Structures are given as structure tokens and as C-alpha cells.
Amino acid sequence: MCLVSQEMRKLAPELDPLRIGTGWKKEDLGKVQVMVESTYGDSHPGSGHLNILVEEVRKGIAEEGGFGARYFCTDICDGESQGTDGINYSLASREMIANMIEIHANATPFDAGVYLSSCDKGVPGNIMGLARVNIPSVFVPGGTMNAGPEMLTLEQLGMYSAQYERGEIDEEKLDWAKCNACPSCGACSFIGTASTLQIMAEALGLALPGSALMPATSPDLLEYAKEAGRQSVRLAKMKNMKPSDIVTMESFENAILVHAAISGSTNCLLHLPAIAHELGIEITGDTFDRLHRNARYLLDVRPAGRWPAECFYYAGGVPAIMEEIKQHLHLDVMTVTGKTLGENLEELKNNGFYEKCDKWLQEFNKRYNINLTKNDIIRSYDNAIGTDGSIAILKGNLAPEGAVIKHTACPEEMFKSVLHARPFDSEEECLDAVLKHKVQKGDAVFIRYEGPKGSGMPEMFYTSEAISSDKELGKSIALITDGRFSGASTGPVIGHCSPEAVDGGPIALVEEDDLIEIDVMERKLNIVGVNGERKSMEEIDEILKERRAKWTPRKPKYEKGVLRLFSQHAASPMKGAYLDY
């Protein structure tokens, strides 16, 4: 067994004394050396507890005869920066996390890695980093927070805030929601981007079976972290067990089918393609659309369903979802256990995993005085909530490269409609118009110049919540943007409209009272009229040519710093919006 760490010790005589100065003992220097990288920090509840898991990982590494070194690059929280210019840094932060992992792993020699994170950009940033570094690796999901009183979860704050702005609730009720929505550490308790990406990590075969999205307060999570440490040392001693050996196109297809089954966040269409890019695999929006068609949607968890995210684990987690859709999965793909996916699923049936999950479900039932069963949370294949996946890629003269809609969270009344365009060049203007009812039934509200190159691709969460929580507007208008949406977003919202406005995409050419055709089942998104009147598609093409000739590109929004770099080099949202140097 040839260890990179030991070869480098021969080349760099300063390495040993520097590590001893960091707290290593002489006997540690010759062991398998594992980088334990996490997003631990006080940035948000999803990262605040990871130091505890890091120490469990290190214990597991030590038990298997290795030594674990701690490295940190904390992430930011979309929720904390929501509605401010801070949200513009969110997607770019994913790239910076991946870059720091590359730097940490390549500047100092390691034989394996364990990566811990919980949330929106921390999880994909870590997975992109581990794929780029490509040493034997295990990912540890940080789990989900518990629900609060009355089963309150954070994604409901947008609704409460909009209700308060409209005078429907008082300040006391809003304050109650704020003080109770996040009662513990962990990712927010709904199938948003954080939860979706934890699930994707396991579905790709990079996390231990059954480890995704368990409650962050559970003692089970500590044991999973310790076992991940043990497994990293084992992987370092095995051949052909690097991330590039484990994760294949078939692995991504499995993950996307799981994404369909859970009605996962639309932000996954940014993250899985970016991860795939690091591995030399091409995943696009079209890949998602192909696999979501006729796929079973099974998970009755918020925001599209009824229950908080902790219930996902109580119902059996990723393995239970995979068992239901097993006939469509590639069961021969390799995983970090050193076994195939099929072998892992069979082992879980016999090792008490499902019995343990059910025990936690009974505890949850007692807490809220209800009587949920596994099938109330994860439907059977034959009793699916839906049979056409959960997202669709719409294309047409408004989005030649595509735009994404989560149709499982959209009122069916909006699946096929022709609306009147109301374009805005900032979210602030649009939100003000929605809250003051300056938009009306039958409008298609546009927020543009918010793509990766435009402003960093922030979320349009407050505007989408203001629309979906309005009893009239939520079923009668649509929001279309080249930006993105929170994983908590619901309603008739269409994002990632590509090409983006700053690149001269058709969304930049939309004018007041254009007629906008949305057809979810036919996957269409078109401008079909101007000034409120229908036109032929040939006429529309000529009108768009005339508008393009008059269109003037905007000056770059950022003149320096990270966002200048990101806006100059970001790829299309349909390819993952990664830094394409």
C-alpha cells in the first residue's frame, strides 16, 4: 500500500515538525492521514453543530488506525441574506468552498477525506471539491432540524411575513413564528435545497446508506459520523475507490430519479450539473426533464407536502425511496461502502435500520399527538402522489435553452395559460407591486437581470411567497425570472430562464402586455403576442429581431471582488452556473 502522505514526508522534511507543532504525536505521522473538512461555524444552524460530528469522525479514523486533521471553510445562509444584496453571494460561495477544498487537499498531502456539511451551498460545494480533489472520500450529511410547536417550520415564515404586510396577522403572531421556527441545529426542516442535496449525496453513493437527513439532534447521526471516519481509512487502503471510480452517469440518473420522487428543490438543477462537470460528465436541464417524465413522486413532505423533513428519516429515508423505485435504478453502481447500491439496500433490510426508523416515528407521533405511518410520508409506488416527476424544463422563444418549473408545487390551474407580461428589472420593484396589488389576475410578472452573470443569481423567495400566499394571485399569475428560487418556494414560479437577460436572452426583450404562453405538459414557454394581441410565431420572431437590434447590453454590475469574477465566468444555469474559466 503506497500512501501519498508518506511519500510527501520524504520530500518535505519540514512537514513532520510542523504537524507535531499542531498537536500530532510522532506515532501519528506514519498513519493513514485523512483530511476532515467541514463547514463548521456560527453562520447558521446547519453548520453550528458540525464540530461535534467532526470529533466523532476523528474518533472513527483513530479506531481504524488513521489520523484525522481538521480543516474548515464555513458557508453562508441564504435565509439570513434573503431579501438583501447579500443573497447575491450565495451561489458564488459554492465555488469558493470547492476552491478552498482543492487548496486544502492539494497544498498538504492526504490519503483520504471526510467532508461534512448540511446546507444549500455547503453540500454541493463540498461534493464539487471532493470530486475535483479525487482522493478516497466519504460525505457526512449534517441532518435536519426538528420542527417547532404546531409543527412549525422555517419555510412558513415567508407566508407569515406576507400575511403581516397585508394586515392579515398581528406582530405578536409574526414574532411567535420567528421565535419557534428553528428550535435546533440542522438544515431547515423541509425539502428545500439543503435537504435535497443531503439526499443527493447519498443517492450518488457518496454518503453511507441511510445517513441523509436524519434529525441533527439524533444520537444515530453521531454513530454515522464515526463510521464515516472508519470507512475513509478503509477506502484509503483499497484500489479504485476514488470519487471518479464511484460516481458515474448511472449514479446521476439514480439521483435524479430520487429527486423526482422527493419533489426536490429546483436548485438541484444548478448543483448536480456542476458536480458532474467536476467528474467530466455532462448533466443538463434536459437530463432532468427526460428522467422526470413518467417518474413517480412519492414524498409527502413540505413544501410540496404536509410533513416536516425529519419525517423523511422516520419513514426510512433514501433507502425507503429507492426500494419503491428500485425497478428504475441502476443497482450495480458502486458506493462508498465498497458495495453496490443493490447490496446496500439488501443489507439494510436485515440490520435493523427500518425498525430503528419506525421507533423514531413513534416518538414523533407522541410529540405531536398524531398517528403517522411510513406510508403517510413515503407513498408506495402504486399509490404515488404523481406520475410525472416533479419538475419540467420549459422551452420556446422566451427560453431557448430552457427554464425550470416545479409543477408539483404549482396550482394545476396554471399548467396551461396565456398571461400578460409585467416586466421588472429588480426584485424590489416587483415585490412592492405584488404586495400593493399593482399586479392583477392574468399577469406574468418578470424579474430579470438576476442570472449568474447579471447579479450572481439570487433567490426570488419573498416575491414568490407573496404571490403563492395570496389567495387570488397564487392561482392566477406567474413569476418568471432568470434568477432562481428558494427550495421552499411554491406556486406558479418559473426560474433559470436561459439565456439570461444580461447575455441578451429573450427575457431581456419582453415588454409590457406581451402575451406569454405557459404549457407545462407540452413543456412550452413562448411569447405569443404583443400589446395584448395574438401574433403568429413568424411575426413574433420579426418583432424580437427588431427589439434585439435596439437592445443595449448593461454595464457589469460589479467592478471588483468575488461577484465580478463570478459574473464574468459563470456558465449557463442549464449547465450548472459553475465557474467556467
PLM segments and residue spans:
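Well-ordered mid-protein domain cores that form the structural environment of catalytic cofactors
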Residues: 91-94, 98
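A short, small-residue-rich loop immediately preceding and capping a beta-strand
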Residues: 105-126, 138-141
